[in-house]
Amino acid sequence: MSRIDGRKNDELRTVEIIPNINKFAEGSCLIRCGNTHVLCTASVEDRPPRHVPEGEGWVTAEYSMLPRANRERSRRDISKLKLNGRSAEIQRLIGRALRAVVDRKKLGPWNITIDCDVLQGDGGTRTASITGGFVAMMLAFRKMMEAGQLAEYPVSGYVAAVSAGIVDDVPMLDLCYEEDSSAMVDLNCVMDDRGRLIEVQGTGEERPFTLEEQQRLVELCAKGIRELQEIQRRVLEDR
């Protein structure tokens, strides 16, 4: 079957990462994955959470969608006086994904908050937030290195994420909203640059799926993540 935007089944949407989009944040970027656009900023504070051992740092994330990021306006979380359950789940995922490649002892007594604000959502907002959030975090670490706040980069590698799914029994990479909403199976994958899995979230939306189908989706994601990490490298090396 042909895809909505004419892509091959194993092809990413057009990806662009624009660094240093916010002059006030220690690190920032705008990531565009097709029609999904996410603003990612990294803020540095010298107050790690209380649960963190003395001398260690922490990386956390917050995620939200602008009211008109989708086809219809949604209410802001603040107007409901509570965090949307979906947003809470996604920001925990982003934080876990980024912490997986951070050496908290090398980070030292610093708290890094990654804010991911979806300007426009067309599927894959959580995975775009992880991919862009990593770039924002690395730019913040660079600024900290220049200021003498870090002795070395406290990361073990790159991290990126992408989705895949089965639509009309066909495995596809990087689903847009229309594909995602009609997918039989939906899977999100986070990996480091050594091909190691950090998190896999798979759901049988319309039917159960086999281990072979899951493996095919993970392989599609691995291909896409390698390409995303090359984009991350080019952006960070050009700075």
Which residues are covered by each model-predicted region?
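Glycine-rich, charged/polar anion/phosphate-binding loops
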Residues: 15-18, 24-27, 45-47, 99-101, ...
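Structured core elements
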Residues: 16-18, 30-32, 39-41, 60-62, ...
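Glycine-rich, flexible beta-strand/loop modules in the N-terminal catalytic cores of phosphate-handling
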Residues: 21, 29-107, 197-219
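A short glycine/serine-rich beta->alpha loop
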Residues: 79-83, 116-125
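Buried hydrophobic packing segments
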Residues: 94, 98, 132-141
